[in-house]
């Protein structure tokens, strides 16, 4: 069977073209529309993964014109706006940043439009009748996160090595599940900051 993605060729393409891309991004006529497009698409996709039913077009309409349509909940529109705001505050302009406890809590706070604090309750992944994973107890989260943060600064030589280390780091973050909500969206913000770094 054919793989869904031809990762080897895509990684090779990124490896060979990254310097050219970095050079092009120095031109504001290229970087500004790219950055805006990234922010909107990431806002849409990070929420779609969580089950938000807004289309990309509907997400852009609410972000650009505050336009809402029927068949969607208020929270779906709020999630789109919150994610976009988080991206604007935390990831743009694309610049290196230290991913520490403050950064992570701030990102989660923007995503949820509230104070980003580690959870103080037991949570589960899945639904009430079929939990697929029980994250660590809340009292263990601060220490687990301190340990996780020590490995958040990804050092690698090749693009493939960067991707592999970030993916493994992301799995560890999601297994800790440090927040009562927004862990997936926060984790994807971290992935993007790690790629920027």
Report the location of each language-model feature.
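FIC/Doc superfamily catalytic core
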Residues: 1-197
């Amino acid at each position: 069977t054919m793989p869904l993605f031809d990762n080897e060729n895509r990684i090779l393409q990124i490896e060979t073209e990254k310097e050219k891309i970095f050079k092009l991004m120095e031109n504001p006529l290229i970087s500004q529309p790219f950055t805006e497009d990234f922010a909107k698409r990431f806002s849409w996709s990070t929420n779609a993964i969580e089950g938000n039913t807004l289309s990309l077009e509907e997400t852009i309409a609410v972000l650009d014109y505050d336009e809402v349509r029927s068949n969607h909940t208020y929270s779906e529109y709020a999630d789109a706006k919150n994610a976009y705001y988080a991206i604007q505050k935390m990831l743009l302009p694309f610049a290196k940043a230290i991913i520490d406890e403050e950064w992570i809590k701030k990102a989660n706070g923007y995503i949820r439009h509230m104070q980003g604090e580690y959870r103080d309750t037991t949570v589960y992944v899945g639904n009430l009748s079929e939990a697929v994973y029980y994250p660590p107890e809340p009292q263990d989260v601060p220490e687990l996160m301190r340990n996780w943060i020590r490995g958040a600064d990804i050092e690698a030589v090749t693009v493939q090595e960067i991707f592999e280390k970030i993916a493994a780091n992301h799995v560890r973050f999601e297994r800790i599940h440090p927040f009562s909500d927004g862990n997936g969206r926060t984790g994807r913000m971290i992935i993007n900051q790690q790629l920027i770094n």
